[in-house]
Amino acid sequence: MLAGCASVDYSVVEPALYEGAIEELQQELRENPDSAEARRSLGLIYLRTGAFRDARTELQAAYDGGVEDPEALFSLGLAHERSGEQRAAIEAYRRYTDLPRTSRYREPMQGRYLLLARQVARAQVRRALAAEATLTDQAPARHVVGVVPLSYQGREPRFEPLGEGLAEMIAIDLAQVQQLRVVERVRLDAVLDELELGASDVVAVASAPRTGRLLGAGRLVAGTYDVLDEETLRLDAALWEMAEAEEPGVESRTDALEQLFAMQKQLVFSLIERMGIRLTAEERARIGEVPTDDLEAFLEFARGLAFERQGQYTEAAQAFSRAAVQDPSFAQATEAQARAQGMQTATGDAASFQRTTLVPAVGPAPIGAAPLSRRLQELSIGLGADDVPGDPDERRPAPEVSDEPPRLPDPPPPPSN
């Protein structure tokens, strides 16, 4: 693994460790080319030994042949990534929702998916900035809505993250409307970071149209809030129509802080009415659902979102955990905790990610000393060795779960929410 002055890649091991196993698997495939299990095992070995393109080929063939266990799906994404195929890696990692929640591969797959999606979004925003002059001639898509964090006008630090949580709830509610598509947080974060804009900057007359163009959004929801004497909440939300030159209309609400969730719902319904959209009974019912009525849990959730936006995933996971403990029925907090933990696991380049997530290989058994399956287990290839206690049989096709993968920014095709 050493070439000239090149550094050693500690994420892989010497192919000689697997020489006998590779020969046996290749022989098996010559005799039975349709053996998806043999291709799976060979692909896992190639991934461990740095033959990434060969690993991708064999693991894709195994997947096409019906192998859908968590280790194979995880390894397929990693093989694509190590081969420099980012879009294909994203497509593989996005299938983390197909894995059992108890699988040890679900969290790193989710984290890597989100990390690569953020990289893609930032690259797209940079390209859009480079070609910004041409964007002014493009008609904005009115059905696409961006929701930015609300800007805090008060002085009490305890309530400063609340704008993140309010924006997230508004975005979740607007996403229930079939006629609308809400800009993903990953793309929103990329635009705000590249423009070096804070929440207060976005609501400025000069900034909002530019932000909307870069988001590809025909509408932009922004606003301000304040908490007076820790008892009274004032919310002001503006709806920018990018195709119109005039300043936006503002929806305002003032009530007791404990009425936060009712106020947020009222704002959403008013914004939708201002857009001229008539909701179905089903859409109205979904929007009316309140994820939590616990203010402290919601504040912790909002803090987690703020940490997450800053790339502080450990602190974000801790805040989301506190929110979930405060209100165990707060499903968004539980999901966000898993997301932040996945991001924490998935940081770094592909080589360091492989090194920290795959179980290191141990010394090889003597070739010919044991059956192939036993030797693969001893070499930590997987074959069940990495299952966590209580997991269902991960060699069987994983059952689908109810949550859907987050939608990626365009391109890369095709992931959709």
Description of each model-found segment:
Residues 14-26, 49-61, 83-92, 312-315, ...:
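Structural signature of tandem alpha-helical TPR/SEL1-like repeats
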Residues 8-10, 15-23, 98-100, 105-111, ...:
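C-terminal/domain-edge helix-coil "capping" segments
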Residues 9-41, 45, 49, 64, ...:
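Post-signal peptide N-terminal segment of mature Sec-exported envelope proteins
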Residues 73, 84, 91-98, 202-276:
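Amphipathic beta-strand/beta-sheet edge segments enriched in Tyr/Trp
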Residues 139-208, 218-233, 244-251, 286, ...:
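Short beta-strand->alpha-helix linker/helix-N-cap micro-motif
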Residues 27-31, 61-64, 97-98, 324-325:
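Conserved structural position within tetratricopeptide repeats
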